[in-house]
UniProtKB/Swiss-Prot annotation:
Placement of sequence motif Microbody targeting signal: 610-612
Molecular function terms, GO-annotated: carnitine O-octanoyltransferase activity
GO biological process, one term: fatty acid transport
Protein name per Swiss-Prot or TrEMBL: Peroxisomal carnitine O-octanoyltransferase
One Pfam family, short name: Carn_acyltransf
Similarity-based family: Belongs to the carnitine/choline acetyltransferase family.
Natural source organism: Mus musculus
Length: 612
């Protein structure tokens, strides 16, 4: 990835889009076989027998018919899932998306040239903006290298959704507005929006056809910051984006009915490249401990976040940065890519601007002054209170395991991602005394507009291994053998899922066909084992590998009694971030992370002692 980012290439970013294969529909029999295997850890014999009968009936009856209809749909679309997934996973969801759906992550610059330091916010911010805008230009010019797996190009469509993209709330379903264009496609917006102390501003990032420089960006930021510091706090319209979706949709309609100019102002935020947030708070952040950064990124002041924007770049008063992104238009790997690019530039320049200090005579930022009334101001304070109350329930444990990392697991011929997934299974098993149904993201970008598939990490093999680790009579060799079986199973599942042979999205497709056709919901989806094994968004462990770079992220748990678990892998360490809800008496993110680190040691020890 690193050299892919920086080498200059002839290939254009989006040149392979039209030649990517369509997303396949797996064989029904295969999907159902895999589904049955995945429910086994959560069933006793009688329950499993009953589910087996339900699956058999489905395969020969309703499932067969629905599968045929799904194949018909797939014949007419290059990606049969895309529109459905967007609607079901994101746009139809009514709970507040800023806290519950968005993903956040700190920028890793505090590990090197930019440790937390008061008084650095605006100057560092001007350089952050500059590097981000350079990335935007690379994308506009299609100079961003195509991601590949070996020599196979991967789908790059999600990168179109990074800039000038915004979700717009609807009464029953939201929509996504995307205004980005490459240079060859024509003009697109060239302004950014800045939120500070409840007020909103916009300014253009091009002057006479060139990007404005860090000294010029600093002048714009200083103007905004000074103005907001010396005058009363603004109406905080942005806080409405943290509301329940239908409430926000109604508040937005009302806001526009107050004054049509309000729509023009909303559209300036929607079309902006991204939103830059100037925060007054200073989260504690060291390379070893930065849980507070995550908590503030997800749960911080909603009046300086536009929750629906695909990219909020957030700056804190102590010069720490992070992002808060709407998950609907793209997956986290897009943000990982730009965050890594910016971090590399900060390293290269030692965090300083070494160019001209000249500031041209560029127009000052324009404030977006909304027409508001008592009702809107009440809606805003209700939204703020709702968001801050819900966010106070969130616990995030961000920790770094430094005893070893990828280098050692590779030496033992263990895949580092699988290593972490199995450690999580063992930790959950030890902490809760039962297996935990688990969702790990696999990417399906080999296919046209491919996004993700579910790897169900809690396998029969993983559970057998966990049991052997807790069984004092099991020998080291037996434990090691069971662990290696669990590794092999996980690696195969990950490969299958990435190549379009998962089953969760397939089952979702069959359910949605039934709904669209007005048919009864098949028994398979109403079977208690369907949800107990994670189906229908019920995974107690919602997890993802963030990558092999310095970038980290987190999302809230999928269910109230669950965990979100996100991690990245380096040669000498594993960096993890775990989320849980404080109001759930049985979960504790801190404890789970400690147990995972304990499991890392046990697993490596198992490999070492079993060699003897």
């Amino acid at each position: 990835m690193e050299n892919q980012l920086t080498k200059s290439v002839e290939e254009r970013t989006f040149q392979y889009q039209d030649s990517l294969p369509s997303l396949p529909v797996p064989a029904l029999e295969e999907s159902l076989k895999k589904y049955l295997e995945s429910v086994k850890p959560f069933a006793n014999e009688d329950e499993y027998k009953k589910t087996e009968e339900i699956v058999q009936k489905f395969q020969e009856g309703a499932g067969k018919r629905l599968h045929q209809k799904l194949l018909e749909r797939a014949r007419g679309k290059r990606n049969w899932l895309e529109e459905w997934w967007l609607n079901v996973a994101y746009l139809d969801v009514r709970i507040p998306s800023q806290l519950n759906v968005n993903f956040v992550g700190p920028c890793p610059h505090f590990e090197h040239y930019w440790p937390a330091r008061e008084g650095t916010q605006l100057e560092r911010g001007s350089m952050m903006l500059w590097h981000n805008l350079n990335y935007w230009q690379l994308l506009r010019r299609e100079k961003l290298p195509v991601h590949k797996s070996g020599n196979t190009p991967l789908d790059m469509n999600q990168f179109r959704m990074l800039f000038s993209t915004c979700k717009v709330p609807g009464i029953t379903r939201d929509s996504i507005m995307n205004y980005f264009k490459t240079e060859s496609e024509g003009h697109c917006p060239t302004h950014i929006a800045v939120l500070c102390r409840g007020r909103a501003f916009v300014f253009d990032v091009l002057h006479e056809g060139c990007l404005i420089t860090p000294p010029e960006l600093l002048r714009q930021l200083t103007y905004i910051h000074k103005k907001c510091s010396n005058e009363p706090v603004g109406p905080s319209i942005a806080a409405l984006t943290s509301e329940e979706r239908t409430r926000w949709a109604k508040a937005r309609e009302y806001l526009i009915s107050l004054d049509p100019e309000n729509l023009t102002l909303l559209e300036k935020i929607q079309t902006s490249l991204f939103v830059y947030s100037i925060e007054d708070s200073s989260p504690h952040a060291t390379p070893e401990e930065y849980s507070q950064v995550f908590e503030m990124l997800l749960g911080g002041d909603p009046s300086v976040r536009w929750g629906d924007k695909s990219y909020n770049l957030i700056s804190f008063a102590n010069g720490i940065f992070g992002c808060c992104c709407d998950h609907a238009p793209y997956d986290a790997m897009v943000m990982v890519n730009i965050a890594h690019y910016v971090d590399e530039r900060v390293l290269e320049t030692e965090g300083r601007w070494k160019g001209s200090e000249k500031v041209r005579d560029i127009p000052l930022p324009e404030e977006l002054v909304f027409t508001v009334d008592e009702k809107i101001l009440n809606d805003v304070s209700q939204a703020k209170a709702q968001h801050l109350k819900a966010a106070s329930d969130l616990q995030i444990a961000a920790s770094t395991f430094t005893s070893f990392g990828k280098k050692l697991t590779k030496e033992e011929a263990l895949h580092p991602d699988t290593f972490i997934q199995l450690a999580l299974q063992l930790a959950y098993y030890r902490l809760h005394g039962r297996p935990g149904c688990c969702y790990e993201t696999a990417m399906t970008r080999y296919f046209y507009h491919g996004r993700t598939e579910t790897v169900r990490s809690c396998t029969v093999e993983a559970v057998r291994w966990c049991q052997s680790m807790q069984d004092p009579s099991a020998s080291l060799l037996e434990r090691q053998q069971k662990m290696l079986e669990a590794f092999a199973k996980h690696n195969k599942m990950m490969k299958d899922c990435s190549h379009g042979k998962g089953f969760d999205r397939h089952l979702l497709g069959l359910l949605l066909i039934a709904k669209e056709e007005g048919l009864p919901v098949p028994e398979l989806f109403e079977d208690p084992l369907f949800s107990r094994s994670g189906g229908g968004g019920n995974f107690v462990l919602s997890t993802s590998l963030v990558g092999y770079l310095r970038v980290q992220g987190v999302v809230v748990p999928m269910v109230h009694n669950g965990y979100g678990f996100f991690y990245h892998i380096r040669d000498d360490r594993f960096v993890v971030a775990c989320s849980s809800w404080r109001s759930c008496p049985e979960t504790d993110a801190e404890k789970l992370v400690q147990m995972i680190f304990h499991a890392f040691h046990d697993m490596i020890q198992l490999m070492n002692t079993a060699h003897l």
